[in-house]
């Protein structure tokens, strides 16, 4: 388990309040949460962060490679404490801008949604027919 973002967890708990984080996001901050990880990257790897425009979970990366869409399902987004509002089912934009400025955020979709078809480029790489949902 990656525990490098311990300081960032402490800072975000102090900034937003642990009870408020749980109320709004549904879970406490842990070393697995996206917010502290992005803050750690920004602080400790500024060159890498500066050359980053998007972040991906494994599922969203695969969907992007196959369809060209930058999306994340709501279930996965619920692991993005303190950046995802569970009740509103939306990114908490002010926190996203504060913790990870300059990054694009994936469009939120439901796990059952068809978000696109396999592209021609992905067909060449995978053998999956273009247009396959």
Where are these regions (language model features)?
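Active-site phosphate-binding/coordination module
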Residues: 1-35
């Amino acid at each position: 388990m990656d525990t490098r973002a311990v300081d960032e967890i402490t800072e975000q708990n102090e900034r937003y309040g642990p009870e408020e984080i749980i109320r709004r996001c549904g879970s406490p901050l842990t070393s697995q949460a996206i917010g502290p990880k992005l803050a750690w990257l920004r602080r400790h790897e500024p060159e890498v962060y500066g050359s980053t425009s998007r972040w991906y979970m494994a599922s969203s990366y695969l969907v992007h490679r196959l369809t060209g869409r930058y999306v994340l399902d709501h279930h996965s987004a619920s692991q993005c404490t303190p950046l995802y509002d569970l009740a509103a089912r939306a990114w908490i934009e002010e926190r996203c801008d504060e913790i990870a400025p300059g990054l694009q955020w994936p469009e939120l979709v439901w796990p059952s949604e068809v978000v696109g078809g396999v592209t021609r480029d992905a067909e060449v790489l995978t053998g999956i027919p273009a247009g396959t949902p």
